[in-house]
Each structure stands twice: as C-alpha cells, then as structure tokens.
C-alpha cells in the first residue's frame, strides 16, 4: 500500500494518543491517581507514534507472514524502547521506566516480557488499527484533514522546541 505523508502523520498522532492513553491508564491504576505519562505537551507519547509509523513503513511486506510480522514488530518496538529510554534519561535526567526487576532485561529499559507484548500490539496495529485509523481519518475532507494534521504537527513541534 502507498501511504502519503498525511497518512503517516495521522497514524503518528493516533498511536501517540493511544500510547499515552495506555501508559496513563496503567500508571493511574497502579498509583491510584492520575499520572500524565506523556513526554510531549498534550496527550501524546511520541515513542508509540514514531514506532507505529516505522512499523507501517518498513514491515508492510511481512503482512502475509504473522510470525515474521510479529518478530519484526517486536524487534522494532524493543529497539525504539531501548533507544528512547537512554535518550529520555539523558535529556530528562531520570529513568522514565525501569524493568530492572524483570527477567531478561537489558539496562532496565527493555525486557522479554514487554518485547513480546509490543510484538503482539504491533501486529494488531498493522493488521487492524491502521485500517480503522486511516478509514476514520479519510472521513474528513482532504483539505480539512491536511490542515488539521499540519496544525497538530506545528503545535507539537513548537511546544517541544520551546520546552527544550
């Protein structure tokens, strides 16, 4: 399938929001109060959006092979999580998550348990989430969708650059 820049932007915002929702919900249940798990201003967890776009771009040809698709999603998500963990520790001056107490962890940033989970979520996203997300995105007239995506992109970029 040929994706446009607008498809990729739409998928980025969709998965960044869903990732934020997942992270915030899990943290709120564990801590029994609201915790904003986003790194960007607003309800977004960029690692989810970036990883989903990367998977969409580079794993499309594996759609017909569930095992290889799962392995590809697992590898990409795990690599993204490991890199993001180190980057966020350097620029955020602290660990945003710590899997040190989990079996088969590396640097406390990745572990086999979550790598398998990311692989499963990646397969679900590529098999079902992208279709649903892009169908909803394309319900809006092209001009409205394009302007909205660029405004969102500009707002996130501006607030991120101002914060750093």
Spans of features found by a protein language model:
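Membrane-water interface of alpha-helical transmembrane segments
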Residues: 3-10, 68, 108, 112, ...
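Membrane-interface starts of transmembrane alpha-helices
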Residues: 40, 64-76, 141
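Functional transmembrane or membrane-interface alpha-helices that line membrane-embedded catalytic
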Residues: 3, 30-67, 88-130
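Conserved small/polar residues in nucleotide/adenosyl-binding loops
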Residues: 159-164
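Membrane-interface helix termini and inter-helical loops of multi-pass transporters
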Residues: 131-140
């Amino acid at each position: 399938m040929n994706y446009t820049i607008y498809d990729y932007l739409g998928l980025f915002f969709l998965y960044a929001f869903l990732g934020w929702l997942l992270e915030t919900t899990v943290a709120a249940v564990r801590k029994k109060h609201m915790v904003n798990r986003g790194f960007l201003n607003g309800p977004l967890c960029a690692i989810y959006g970036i990883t989903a776009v990367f998977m969409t771009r580079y794993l499309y040809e594996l759609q017909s092979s569930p095992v290889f698709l799962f392995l590809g999603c697992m590898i990409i998500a795990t690599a993204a999580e490991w890199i993001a963990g180190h980057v966020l520790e350097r620029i955020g001056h602290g660990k945003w998550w710590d899997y040190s107490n989990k079996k088969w962890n590396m640097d406390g940033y990745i572990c086999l348990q979550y790598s398998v989970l990311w692989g499963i979520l990646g397969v679900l996203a590529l098999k079902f989430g992208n279709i649903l997300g892009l169908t909803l995105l394309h319900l809006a007239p092209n001009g409205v969708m394009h302007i909205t995506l660029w405004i969102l992109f500009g707002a996130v970029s501006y607030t991120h650059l101002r914060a750093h």
